[in-house]
Each structure stands twice: as structure tokens, then as C-alpha cells.
Curated annotation (Swiss-Prot):
<comment type="similarity">
    <text>Belongs to the metallo-beta-lactamase superfamily. RNA-metabolizing metallo-beta-lactamase-like family. INTS11 subfamily.</text>
</comment>
<keyword id="KW-0507">mRNA processing</keyword>
<protein>
    <recommendedName>
        <fullName>Cleavage and polyadenylation specificity factor subunit 3-I</fullName>
        <ecNumber>3.1.27.-</ecNumber>
    </recommendedName>
</protein>
<dbReference type="GO" id="GO:0006397">
    <property type="term" value="P:mRNA processing"/>
</dbReference>
<dbReference type="Pfam" id="PF10996">
    <property type="entry name" value="Beta-Casp"/>
</dbReference>
<keyword id="KW-0378">Hydrolase</keyword>
<comment type="function">
    <text>Component of the cleavage and polyadenylation specificity factor (CPSF) complex that play a key role in pre-mRNA 3'-end formation, recognizing the AAUAAA signal sequence and interacting with poly(A) polymerase and other factors to bring about cleavage and poly(A) addition. May function as mRNA 3'-end-processing endonuclease and also be involved in the histone 3'-end pre-mRNA processing.</text>
</comment>
<dbReference type="GO" id="GO:0005634">
    <property type="term" value="C:nucleus"/>
</dbReference>
<dbReference type="Pfam" id="PF16661">
    <property type="entry name" value="Lactamase_B_6"/>
</dbReference>
<keyword id="KW-0539">Nucleus</keyword>
<keyword id="KW-0540">Nuclease</keyword>
<dbReference type="InterPro" id="IPR021718">
    <property type="entry name" value="CPSF73-100_C"/>
</dbReference>
<dbReference type="Pfam" id="PF07521">
    <property type="entry name" value="RMMBL"/>
</dbReference>
<dbReference type="GO" id="GO:0016180">
    <property type="term" value="P:snRNA processing"/>
</dbReference>
<dbReference type="InterPro" id="IPR022712">
    <property type="entry name" value="Beta_Casp"/>
</dbReference>
<comment type="subunit">
    <text>Component of the CPSF complex, at least composed of CPSF160, CPSF100, CPSF73-I, CPSF73-II, CPSF30, FY and FIPS5. Interacts with CLPS3, CPSF100, CPSF160 and FY.</text>
</comment>
<dbReference type="GO" id="GO:0004518">
    <property type="term" value="F:nuclease activity"/>
</dbReference>
Length: 693
């Protein structure tokens, strides 16, 4: 492991009540070990880490506190490894709640998950009413689980995440989540010590803003692996030498494989033990070993090097044992049996049969959850209650030799000092052990800049983060570095919490979006001469091209290469253009102009009284037309408090008096453009009257 002198650079995130709120709530494993499930919410995104059950409870009482959340709001559920206390409520959550998000775990975890949970359903001694799920639910859940490779980055609804090797068991992962630039590391169960078949947990290359970390071992320090292995083999050798039997209760997968590797090697080196059988007693024995034989390349160099000659998980001195009926209990033997907590199954049956004989021994090889028989017998009570309800003396020797693949204090403190997270949340530990760990860790970070929190179940931790919004130019826009004051024009594309600016024609290249052109076409009643329209348009617009329609032979105009004005018949004019903001404004002004020309004809025959009234109304409409035409030419046109029109172009301002036509502006170029444009508009919308007054 790297020393603390090589620690990562801490990410300094400004935190205040004004920032975005991030919430972390343990729904399980808060000041306890069991039913790991941690809820996290930030900027409208919701994540669940793990989905386990409590081994000491049954039925609904074993579940995490799912009623504290809305399952339908969860975007992503990340499972760190296959152990019951981290994955066993997943079938229930997927099939019995409103959850419709996505679920991820590693390949090895998914392979073992189904085996382990199918066995869990079979060996559980609970009533039908207390059954949380059945094999059908497990099979359905398999269809919904997606797999992720180590170091593969996945993005779901703006949530980015990837995983690192965690040690602990085959396929175990630590997940790093990134939401809007805020990073959260969830370790799950991890170990920084390489053992006989697993790599040590990796150190992420990024320092997270928050580290949610297990605290199972508290402030305890593990013995060295060699000392533990020697104690383990010495107890077994001495027990069988005096004719006793050795029971090793263990989970079907995980530490069991590590211990089997030790036993097989020890038996190979001691010919005097070859007549004493070793059994791996689990209904899953053969299937489990097949999985381990498949995922050799996911293990450490030691195993992979051995695999070049032979598969190390094809044991020479260990036989599978599927049930108690297949066991010939005569003479000394070593049996590794499931489940590890001695709640039921083969391990409990053998314990009940052997516990009264002082020649026998029981080795507890790892951490045991409160409330289980395995945890109880570590304290060596005089009597135990058997499965049939009777009591029996506990005469067999009980040895606690921890092969727990959980980080001890030395590993945890070193890992955190290398990682340097400003916020640490402790989970997955007994309350007292967790508090001792917190106090000791505070001495490792005396600067006071590190917050360490120990929330209980359903107790939320709230933090606030200010995240900047940055837009990156990509594609053609990124080829040239703009100078200060330059304008960069493009389309802003938001995906999740990232922003990119790109050229419109590169939208399909750098995003999953595609472009489409909307062609607009309208027909307007018009009975006048087409030449009048041409004359008026040329007065207003700088670019008006005349042509003849090839099919009909009727005249047509192209205004600013955007809008086509065509005579459809003696009574109709059509406009056609590809829709965009500028073309839409040009077409609006042309429509207004044509309608205004159409309205001039009735004025010739109006009576004088009606003509005066019409002129007043027409005057208002003319003002609207003038305004629309100015907007189409200059864009930003507003009516000022003094009654003058205020026109802004590229930071320059001009004021236009609608009555006199006078223009005021410090920018001579803009002043002249506005004056000429207004004169052209005036001549187009206020022509010489056809009737003499």
C-alpha cells in the first residue's frame, strides 16, 4: 500500500447553505451490520447503494427501511457484491415495489447472486407469509440487472459512475459516482490486503468530495495473514489428531474459497492427514466452485500463475457434500458448512450433533452479525439451544480466528489519509465500534477540515455544494481559440449536467440529436399588380431577386435568399421559406406589407367620414408594420420613454423619432443605416395617395 505521503490532492468544494443540497440516508447498516442500503439524493438525482437483508431477522423486519423513500424516484441502484447483507433484498425491491430505475453490478457478482439467493430461499426456515420473494422473483430480477466492468464509465440520466476492485470477495466493487462534478465514493465491504486469491482494494485516482465507508472492524487490528493461517491449521491438525471433528461455518462464497485453498495446500504438505476427509458442505458446493473456476482471470497474480499449470480451485483433498444424508459421520473429519451464522441448514445440523463432545472444535472464521448463534458461541456459553428446542451443553472448543476480508483500522486510516476526502460517512459497523473509530480517525485529521459522520438508520446527513456551470466548445468551434471580446455562435447542448457548444451542422456528430428542416408555406389573397409588391419590397430589403417560376411561368421573388414570394394566380400570392428565427421575421414583415397594399384599394371609394376613420386605424396599423420591419432589419427595437424607438446593434444605440425621421446615435454607421432604412420603409408603407384631396 502507498504511504500517506502520496495522498491525493483534496478537492476543495465551496460548501454553504446557498448551494445545492446533497442528502445521504442509511436505510440499513446505519450504526449496525446487516441490510446494507444507503440512499443518496443530489440535484434531482436519486441513487441507492446496495440492497441487503439483516441475517439475524426474518420477513419484513429483515428489510431495509424502504418506506422512507419513494422507490419510483430512484434512478440507479448499485450493488457492490453478492453477500446476503448487501444484495438479498434486491428481488423484493425490483418485483414488489414501484422501482423502475436501472440496476448495476459486476459480472462475477451477477453470476453468484442467483446461486446464493436461490439457496437462501431453499434453506430459509420461515413461513410462507414471511417469505420476501421466491425463485420466480429471483429469475425476473436477473433480466433487469445490468453488468458493469471495472473502470468502465456509465452514464444514466446525468449520473456518471464507475467502479474499482474492492477485494473482500470475488467481483466486489467500490463505486464512484459523479453528479454535476460532485464525487461520492461508496466502498461497500473492502479489504486493502491481498490474500491467496483476491487482489487488494484499489485506491481511486480521484479524491472524492464524500466517502461513504464501512467500519465493520472499528479500531481492531488484524493479525498478519501468516499468523492467522498457522493458528487455523494448528487447531484443525490437533483436533483431528485426537479423533475430533472440526466444523467451520462459513458463507458458501467468499471466505470459504480462501479457507479451502489453505486446507488443500496444508493437506497436500501433510501426508499423515490424507486419510482424514475434508468436506465442503453446501448445496451450492459444485456450482460455486464452477463460478470460481470461471473467473480465474479476475483474481490476483498468484492464482493466475497457478492456473497456467492447473486450476487451483479443482481441489485434490476436498469433496463436496450436498446434504447431511450423504455424510458418513464416522471418525475425525473437517467440514466447512453453510450458512456462516449457524442459523439453519447443514452447519446448524452438524453443530447440534457435535457441540456436546469436547474433542470437537468449531472455528468461526470471520465477522458474525449480532443475533446469530455463531456470534453467541464466541462468548462460550455453558449451554446452547438446539433447533428442536432442547438445550445441550456446549463442550466443543470454539475458536474465533478472523479471516474477515474487511479493512481493519490500519487499512481504513491509511486508505482515508491517501484519499483525503473532506467528508467521511461511516456505515456498516456496530454503534460502539463506529464511535470508537470516529474518535480515533479524528486524531488522524487534526486540522479540523475533515468532517466524520455516523448516521443511524433513517437519519439523514445534509451537505451543500456549489457547482459551476461550464460549457465546452467542441468540433469546428474548438479549432480556433477566440480572443477576448470575440463572439462564439453555436448551439448549446445540455446532457445531464454537462454543457457543450457546437456548430449546428455538427449536431449529429457530437450528440444523439438530429436536425430537421421545417418548410413553411402560406397563401395570401391579393388582387393587385405583382409589380407593386416587387417595388415595395425593393424599397425595404437590400436583396430582392426577380425570377419566373419554371412550372407556371408566373413571376416570383427571392427576398434575402430566404423567403420566396410567388404569384399563384390572379387572386393569390404564396410565401415559402425554411423556418428559423430570421426567416420567420422576414416572412412576417412581407405578409404585413402585402396585407397593407391590399387594404389601400378600398380607400379610393370610401366616403369622406369613413375615410377619416379608416386613416386613423390605418395609421396605427402602419406603425405596427414599420415596427415589424425595423425588428426584421435590426433585431432589438424597443419604444423608449420619450416616444422614440431605441435600436440596439452590437452594443451601439440609436434613437429614431417616428414623426420627423430624425436619428440620434454616437455611432455614425448605425445612424446612417437606420436613417436610410426608415426612409425606405416610409416610402413603401406610405405611398402617394391615389386620390387627390
Amino acid at each position: 500500500m502507498a504511504s500517506s505521503s502520496t495522498s491525493l490532492k483534496r478537492r476543495e468544494q465551496p460548501i454553504s447553505r446557498d448551494g445545492d443540497q446533497l442528502i445521504v440516508t442509511p436505510l440499513g447498516a446505519g450504526s449496525e451490520v446487516g441490510r446494507s442500503c444507503v440512499y443518496m439524493s443530489f440535484r434531482g438525482k436519486n441513487i441507492l447503494f446496495d440492497c441487503g437483508i439483516h441475517p439475524a431477522y426474518s420477513g419484513m423486519a429483515a428489510l431495509p427501511y424502504f418506506d422512507e423513500i419513494d422507490p419510483s424516484s430512484i434512478d440507479v441502484l448499485l450493488i457492490t457484491h453478492f453477500h446476503i447483507d448487501h444484495a438479498a433484498s434486491l428481488p423484493y425491491f425490483l418485483e414488489k415495489t414501484t422501482f423502475n430505475g436501472r440496476v448495476f453490478m459486476t459480472h462475477a457478482t451477477k453470476a453468484i447472486y442467483k446461486l446464493l439467493l436461490t439457496d437462501y430461499v431453499k434453506v430459509s426456515k420461515v413461513s410462507v407469509e414471511d417469505m420476501l420473494f421466491d425463485e420466480q422473483d429471483i429469475n425476473k430480477s436477473m433480466d433487469k440487472i445490468e453488468v458493469i466492468d471495472f473502470h468502465q464509465t456509465v452514464e444514466v440520466n446525468g449520473i456518471k459512475f464507475w467502479c474499482y476492485t474492492a477485494g473482500h470477495v470475488l467481483g466486489a466493487a467500490m463505486f464512484m459516482v459523479d453528479i454535476a462534478g460532485v464525487r461520492i465514493l461508496y466502498t461497500g465491504d473492502y479489504s486493502r490486503e491481498e490474500d491467496r486469491h483476491l487482489r487488494a482494494a484499489e485506491l481511486p485516482q480521484f479524491s472524492p468530495d464524500i466517502c461513504i465507508i464501512e467500519s465493520t472492524s472499528g479500531v481492531q487490528l488484524h493479525q498478519s495473514r501468516h499468523i492467522r493461517e498457522k493458528r487455523f491449521t494448528d487447531v484443525i491438525h490437533s483436533t483431528v489428531a485426537q479423533g475430533g471433528r472440526v466444523l467451520i461455518p462459513a458463507f458458501a462464497l467468499g471466505r470459504a474459497q480462501e479457507l479451502l485453498l489453505i486446507l488443500d495446500e496444508y493437506w497436500a504438505n501433510h501426508p499423515d492427514l490424507h486419510n482424514i476427509p475434508i468436506y465442503y458442505a453446501s448445496p451450492l458446493a459444485k456450482k460455486c466452485m464452477a463460478v470460481y473456476q470461471t473467473y480465474i482471470l479476475s483474481m490476483n497474480d498468484r492464482i493466475r500463475n497457478q492456473f497456467a499449470n492447473s486450476n487451483p480451485f479443482v481441489f485434490k483433498h476436498i469433496s463436496p457434500l450436498n446434504s447431511i444424508d450423504d455424510f458418513n459421520d464416522v471418525g475425525p473429519s473437517v467440514v466447512m458448512a453453510t450458512p456462516g451464522g449457524l442459523q439453519s441448514g447443514l452447519s446448524r445440523q452438524l453443530f447440534d450433533s457435535w457441540c456436546s463432545d469436547k474433542k470437537n472444535a468449531c472455528i468461526i472464521p470471520g465477522y458474525m452479525v449480532e443475533g446469530t448463534l455463531a456470534k453467541t458461541i464466541i462468548n462460550e456459553p455453558k449451554e446452547v439451544t438446539l433447533m428442536n428446542g432442547l438445550t445441550a451443553p456446549l463442550n466443543m472448543q470454539v475458536h474465533y480466528i478472523s479471516f474477515s476480508a474487511h479493512a481493519d483500522y490500519a487499512q481504513t486510516s491509511t486508505f482515508l489519509k491517501e484519499l483525503m476526502p473532506p467528508n467521511i460517512i461511516l456505515v456498516h459497523g456496530e454503534a460502539n465500534e463506529m464511535m470508537r473509530l470516529k474518535q480515533k480517525l479524528l486524531t488522524e485529521f487534526p486540522d479540523g477540515n475533515t468532517k466524520i459522520m455516523t448516521p443511524k438508520n433513517c437519519e439523514s446527513v445534509e451537505m451543500y455544494f456549489n457547482s459551476e456551470k461550464l460549457a465546452k466548445t467542441i468540433g469546428r468551434l474548438a479549432e480556433k481559440t477566440p480572443d477576448v471580446g470575440d463572439t462564439v455562435s453555436g448551439i448549446l447542448v445540455k446532457k445531464g449536467f454537462t454543457y457543450q457548444i457546437m456548430a449546428p451542422d455538427e449536431l449529429h456528430v457530437f450528440s444523439q440529436l438530429s436536425t430537421a428542416t421545417v418548410t413553411q408555406r402560406i397563401t395570401i389573397p391579393f388582387v393587385g399588380a405583382f409589380g407593386v409588391i416587387k417595388h415595395r419590397l425593393e424599397k425595404i430589403f437590400e436583396s430582392v431577386e426577380f425570377s419566373t417560376d419554371e412550372e407556371s411561368g408566373l413571376p416570383a421573388l427571392k427576398v434575402h435568399e430566404r423567403v420566396t414570394v410567388k404569384q399563384e394566380s390572379e387572386k393569390h400570392i404564396s410565401l415559402q421559406w425554411s423556418s428559423d428565427p430570421i426567416s420567420d421575421m422576414v416572412s412576417d414583415s412581407i405578409v404585413a406589407l402585402i396585407l397593407n397594399i391590399s387594404r389601400e384599394v378600398p380607400k379610393i371609394v370610401m366616403e369622406e367620414e369613413d375615410a377619416v376613420k379608416s386613416e386613423e386605424e390605418n395609421g396605427k396599423k402602419v406603425e405596427k408594420v414599420i415596427y415589424a420591419l425595423l425588428v426584421s432589419l435590426f433585431g432589438d427595437v424597443k419604444l423608449g420613454e420619450n416616444g422614440k424607438l431605441v435600436i440596439r446593434v452590437d452594443g451601439n444605440v440609436a434613437q429614431l423619432d417616428k414623426e420627423s425621421g430624425e436619428v440620434e446615435s454616437e455611432h455614425s454607421g448605425l445612424k446612417e443605416r437606420v436613417r436610410v432604412a426608415f426612409e425606405r420603409i416610409q416610402s413603401a408603407v406610405k405611398p402617394i395617395p391615389l386620390s387627390a384631396s
